[in-house]
Amino acid sequence: MGTKIMLVSYKWLKELVDIDVTPAALAEKMSATSIEVEGIEVPADGLSKLVVGHVLSCEDVPETHLHLCQVDTGDETPRQIVCGAPNVKAGIKVIVAVPGARIADNYKIKKGKIRGMESLGMICSLQELGLSDSIIPKEFSDGIQILPEEAVPGDAIFKYLDLDDHIIELSITPNRADALSMRGVAHEVAAIYGKSVSFPQKNLQESDKATSEAIEVAIASDNVLTYASRVVENVKVKPSPQWLQNLLMNAGIRPINNVVDVTNYVLLYFGQPMHAFDYDKFEDHKIVARAARQGESLVTLDGEKRDLTTEDLVITVADKPVALAGVMGGQATEIDANSQTVVLEVAVFDGKSIRKTSGRLNLRSESSSRFEKGVNYATVLEALDFAAAMLQELAEGQVLSGHVQAGQLPTEPVEVSTSLDYVNVRLGTELTFADIQRIFDQLGFGLTGDETSFTVAVPRRRWDVSIPADLVEEIARIYGYDKLPTTLPEAGGTAAELTPTQALRRKVRGLAEGLGLTEIISYALTTPEKAVEFAVAPSHLTELMWPMSVERSALRQNMVSGMLDTVAYNVARKQSNLALYEIGKIFEQEANPKEDLPNELNHFAFAICGLVAQKDFQTQAQAVDFYHAKGILDTLFANLNLKVQYVPTKDLASMHPGRTALILLDEQVIGFVGQVHPGTAKAYSIPETYVAELDMAALEAALPSDQTFAEITKFPAMTRDVALLLDREVSHQAIVTAIESAGVKRLTKIKLFDVYEGVTIQAGKKSMAYSLTFQNPNDNLTDEEVAKYMEKITKALTEQVGAEVR
């Protein structure tokens, strides 16, 4: 939800709260106590010698688009100016930059000649004064700005366009969305300076005809909290007065017409989004706010067709969508120059629903941002009445009596209780109850009780204040953070201890680095294909709705694909002998990715490629292989005192089918190890590479609770070798399992030292030789004891794997 920029007119603010401070001082005070001020801008800065001109005559220059104008700029004689604007004509008041004037980009106006005609200045558009195209009224977007008729020739133009106003740019965090309105900012400034607010009231005169005779409203979704409407008849749609256009442009909003501009004014003033419909374009007189149906669509005011889902909210008439609730109106019912009857809408929609819709459609608006963060329940209907009164005033409309409404909102203050001791302990202050009373009086909050226990009545306009800690924050802000004493904490220190998860991560990291692996950190976001490429059990993908690129669009469900990207990056830079590891998170999603957050699981992974030993005068070069990868894991498991099984698998499509094994711990798959499939390696542009990945949570759950110290025995061990003839398909793991199943307690080590297949061995068979070590920690072993052990082991091998002892 991030921060939202609110552009505050200093002139307008002073009308709402009586302050006598400079804009710079106000900005500093606000930043220190409540809301960060990004900056202050004066649109007139850098502009000079811009005056009102009255076009006395305007003649077309033959065979050109130019016009030769005589302009009264308050001098003794008219000023001749050549102008190319299509909307220049005699009788209008315009902006004139006289010779020596400075306009946007510090451009200086000089006397000149155009097509041989002398031009003593320039008739300006708003763009030439530095205003953005996005906020300039469309009727002036391709031409010059026309000033109000009452503008006096020769006067500086700044006061007529409010370019001399100071625009304070506030950065509003989600918890202070109450300041996304002029009334909210006024309350805040009044609290800071101990002033009172003064909000002008409108005199609403209603006709005898009731709104309920013209319109009916209903709610058919739990995500619509309330919906209310008024009807204004006999409206005259025209441009808004200049003061209203100036106010909107200074707030970053383009003026449209008096009806639409009134709704935007109310948005800025109350923080309450509104919409105006053309009543005569309705096919029915009943408005229903409901969830959209799959397959429905709506052409919004920007001319774009929007395909809707059941997660969207729509305003419907005759069961057809006419607006995307809380985001943007529909083109079919928009206000135009011929509109006569206007339906005004106010509502409160669920912020989460609006956020999903605007995010899915990448359609952010002033309305959607306010619904996402919250609106003041107490002024919803007041805003509706205020807008109707403004239309009565600016559009000569007749307001039907009353309003129609579906759904009710709580408007009474929210009560929060605490004590003076609670406040002082947390702030380190010695405030009195009188101090608390003064602060909450400045905030406009009600207060009852005494220092032992008091209750604060928080107005609905401050929906961010709901618990005692919020009250402490409000007290600290108004009291002054700079006045809070510096105190040391009184609580005694607590000895720190690693959690089991932290301890395991630290141990695994130490073991990995001791084995020669280098830690990397790869991106958690990858492509949808790579996200599941090496996942043993892929789940639903969690994807970004609007990714910067497809390369970083989905949360990973395995670590290996990211490691291979790192391997490829290094190999491309001539670094081919690599041993890398990473401890990070993968993201499994068993539910709906659009509704629920994924599960975050800690995994360990490594990748090795190239040589483990370089060729020198004594040794040959030695390349990595499956057994190097497995050896890393064996060392890891031995240090963790865990016993695992390796089971060959062909189920991982991106791994070599003959050199890959699943890793089982207590019969549960916790990871895999093996060679990356040659085809996959080619796709990544990497050499033969071996990888492994483990579930750290599974390792942690299986760790023995106690590590028992075993005394080093002083009695010697005895070793016996055994050579076995077996079927070629019998694995080393199966042999080890068979040997261990014999139950020989004195067996301490099993080592494979030879594997042979050749002409002396019959087809389909192989020879494997093992060295078995026996040791009694309390006594010397005898040959007879070891012989009995070997007999039991031989029997187990014969029965379980069909081994023939050679």
Curated annotation (Swiss-Prot):
tRNA-binding domain boundaries: 44-158
Q: Which PROSITE patterns match?
A: B5 (PS51483), FDX_ACB (PS51447), TRBD (PS50886)
Q: Which residue ranges does the record assign to the FDX-ACB domain?
A: 713-806
According to the UniProt entry, its GO molecular function terms are:
ATP binding; catalytic activity, acting on a protein; magnesium ion binding; phenylalanine-tRNA ligase activity; transferase activity; tRNA binding
> Boundaries of each B5 domain copy?
411-486
Cellular component (GO) terms are: phenylalanine-tRNA ligase complex
Q: What is its main location?
A: cytoplasm
Electron transport is among the record's keywords: no
According to its UniProt entry, one GO biological process term is: phenylalanyl-tRNA aminoacylation
State the Pfam families in the record: B3_4 (PF03483), B5 (PF03484), FDX-ACB (PF03147), tRNA_bind (PF01588), tRNA_synthFbeta (PF17759)
InterPro entries, alphabetized:
aa-tRNA-synth_II/BPL/LPL, B3/B4_tRNA-bd, DNA-bd_dom_put_sf, Fdx_antiC-bd, Fdx_antiC-bd_sf, NA-bd_OB-fold, Phe-tRNA-ligase_IIc_bsu, Phe-tRNA-ligase_IIc_bsu_bact
* Residues that bind Mg(2+): 464, 470, 473-474
Which Enzyme Commission number(s) are listed?
A: 6.1.1.20
**Catalytic reactions of this protein:** tRNA(Phe) + L-phenylalanine + ATP = L-phenylalanyl-tRNA(Phe) + AMP + diphosphate + H(+)
Which keywords does this chain's UniProt record carry? Aminoacyl-tRNA synthetase, ATP-binding, Cytoplasm, Ligase, Magnesium, Metal-binding, Nucleotide-binding, Protein biosynthesis, RNA-binding, tRNA-binding
Co-factor(s): Mg(2+)
Q: How does it assemble?
A: Tetramer of two alpha and two beta subunits.
**What family is reported?**
Belongs to the phenylalanyl-tRNA synthetase beta subunit family. Type 1 subfamily.
Q: What is this protein called?
A: Phenylalanine--tRNA ligase beta subunit
Gene expressing this chain: pheT
